[in-house]
Amino acid sequence: MSRSALVGNITAMLEDAGFLVSDRCAIRPKSFDVAARRGEDLVLLKILGNVDALDRMTGAEMRRLGGYLDATPLVIGVRTRDEDLKPNVVYFRHGVPVLSPDTAMDLFVEGVPPLIYAAPGGLYVNIDGDLLADEREERGWSLGRLATELGVSRRTVSKYEDGMNASIEIAIQLEEVFDEPFSSPLEVMEGAESVRDSEPTPDDPDPDADDEHVVHILTRAGFTVHPTARAPFKAVGEDDDNRRGVMSLLTGHSSFTKSAKKRARIMSSLGEVTQTRAVYFTETDAKRDAVKGTALVSCAELDAVDDPAAIRDLIRERSQKPTEA
């Protein structure tokens, strides 16, 4: 299956599951392919045939954007370099959770979260340690007795009861011994943080030299500006004074070319899904106020405005207001 067909299939699956899905980010660079929202759940999704194609820089940017937009970065893919992804298993690449299409279908359509995650050494599960301790004590078993049943040390059993994760083989043994499961579902929409190796997210990249002027003006207008390296937009502006009703911004900046117009359309679609406003700053007068929901503001207009509040008002007047979840 081609990557384009895979993206189409995943998009259709998300729509069937009740997600509002953005237009595909059919431009380069792009750290994700689509954004999708269902209620309060927002996903920034990268769709790959081979998940090992996700590089460190893209993974880091997806995690940064997830933090700025209150979203879950997620990869859906078919295989690694060596094998197909297994169903009901969460993998990780550069700190980003990775699911197979079948696992994504179970999670988003059927409402069945995965139980297993891949880590160095094999496949593991979360163990409900409190339940395990209760069941062991109800049987009147000592730590040593259960350790003997499992073929592990007494100290290891104690760690399971304290919340240490277990191999899938141990989880199966526990279920056979007590005739009930002890595995806890993974919170994929929370980034599966309970099992993900903590990988520090790098700082924001420096803005392009051509964008520094725009960054300075937005900062003066009350936004914390986070430049991007591979996103479909140049920066995310976090509103430091949301009382004025602007909220966060997706921003672009360039001459108003055919490519810029396409990028502004995509930003409008992303803004609708991520519940942010979008604004594109142009080097020349675009002869219009907006492309779909993305405000167009020329750099000459920016330079002519001294009052930071007026800049916010200009963006608010020309951009589409975000809708509530």
Curated annotation (Swiss-Prot):
UniProt entry tagged with the keyword Transcription regulation: yes
Matching CDD domains: HTH_XRE
SMART domains (alphabetical): HTH_XRE (SM00530)
Region named Disordered: 189-211
UniProt feature, compositional bias: Acidic residues: 200-211
Molecular function GO terms recorded: DNA binding; DNA-binding transcription factor activity
Gene3D superfamilies (UniProt xref): lambda repressor-like DNA-binding domains
DNA-binding region: 143-162
Pfam families cross-referenced by the UniProt entry: HTH_3
InterPro entries in the cross-refs: Arc_TR_HTH, Cro/C1-type_HTH, Lambda_DNA-bd_dom_sf
This protein's UniProt keywords: DNA-binding, Transcription, Transcription regulation
Residues in HTH cro/C1-type domain copies: 132-186
NCBIfam families for this protein: PRK04140.1
HAMAP family linked: HTH_type_cro_C1
Protein name, entry field: Putative HTH-type transcriptional regulatory protein HQ_3058A
Organism of this sequence: Haloquadratum walsbyi (strain DSM 16790 / HBSQ001)
